[in-house]
Amino acid sequence: MRALQFLLRVSPAFLLLVLCLQLEINKAEESIWKVIQMDLQMPTVAVANEEVTVKLGIQTELKECMVIKAYLRSNIQIDGPFNYRYTSCLCDDYPRTFYWDLVANRTATIAAVVDIIRELDICPEDRAVVPIKSNRYYVLHRLNVS
């Protein structure tokens, strides 16, 4: 009988504990990590045939590392370092920053593109993941040339 009385007295506290744990589990399940966060920095206005520096910062909230390839695209032909492609390992504790110098002679829309790829000898011990949903991310920026 005493055991039953003890169980009935503990029951409301136990139910409250279970409710709190359930709320925390649901909160953790709703956490969505951003696979890629991109910060594209470049001027919006440039003088024709003047060199412009493009800076692309990339980071992730995933706990696993990824092999990324970063490059620029444009709606007009731009030669030189603009066409360089960077391949690197991106981890949550090691964000990456890439730079390009370009010379434009007319207004252009610049796209900074990051592909998550499968490539060996980039990440330590070749431990890297490729997301199932999407493996290409981009951000657009307009460069007005006067």
UniProtKB/Swiss-Prot annotation:
<comment type="subunit">
    <text>Monomer. Interacts with AZGP1.</text>
</comment>
<dbReference type="GO" id="GO:0004190">
    <property type="term" value="F:aspartic-type endopeptidase activity"/>
</dbReference>
<keyword id="KW-0964">Secreted</keyword>
<feature type="signal peptide">
    <location>
        <begin position="1"/>
        <end position="28"/>
    </location>
</feature>
<dbReference type="GO" id="GO:0010628">
    <property type="term" value="P:positive regulation of gene expression"/>
</dbReference>
<feature type="disulfide bond">
    <location>
        <begin position="89"/>
        <end position="123"/>
    </location>
</feature>
<keyword id="KW-0732">Signal</keyword>
<dbReference type="GO" id="GO:0001580">
    <property type="term" value="P:detection of chemical stimulus involved in sensory perception of bitter taste"/>
</dbReference>
<keyword id="KW-1015">Disulfide bond</keyword>
<dbReference type="GO" id="GO:0005634">
    <property type="term" value="C:nucleus"/>
</dbReference>
<feature type="disulfide bond">
    <location>
        <begin position="65"/>
        <end position="91"/>
    </location>
</feature>
<protein>
    <recommendedName>
        <fullName>Prolactin-inducible protein homolog</fullName>
    </recommendedName>
</protein>
<dbReference type="GO" id="GO:0005615">
    <property type="term" value="C:extracellular space"/>
</dbReference>
<dbReference type="GO" id="GO:0019864">
    <property type="term" value="F:IgG binding"/>
</dbReference>
<dbReference type="GO" id="GO:0070233">
    <property type="term" value="P:negative regulation of T cell apoptotic process"/>
</dbReference>
<dbReference type="Pfam" id="PF05326">
    <property type="entry name" value="SVA"/>
</dbReference>
<feature type="glycosylation site" description="N-linked (GlcNAc...) asparagine">
    <location>
        <position position="105"/>
    </location>
</feature>
<dbReference type="GO" id="GO:0042802">
    <property type="term" value="F:identical protein binding"/>
</dbReference>
<comment type="similarity">
    <text>Belongs to the PIP family.</text>
</comment>
<dbReference type="InterPro" id="IPR007990">
    <property type="entry name" value="PIP"/>
</dbReference>
<dbReference type="GO" id="GO:0006508">
    <property type="term" value="P:proteolysis"/>
</dbReference>
<dbReference type="GO" id="GO:0002682">
    <property type="term" value="P:regulation of immune system process"/>
</dbReference>
<keyword id="KW-0325">Glycoprotein</keyword>
<dbReference type="InterPro" id="IPR014756">
    <property type="entry name" value="Ig_E-set"/>
</dbReference>
<dbReference type="InterPro" id="IPR013783">
    <property type="entry name" value="Ig-like_fold"/>
</dbReference>
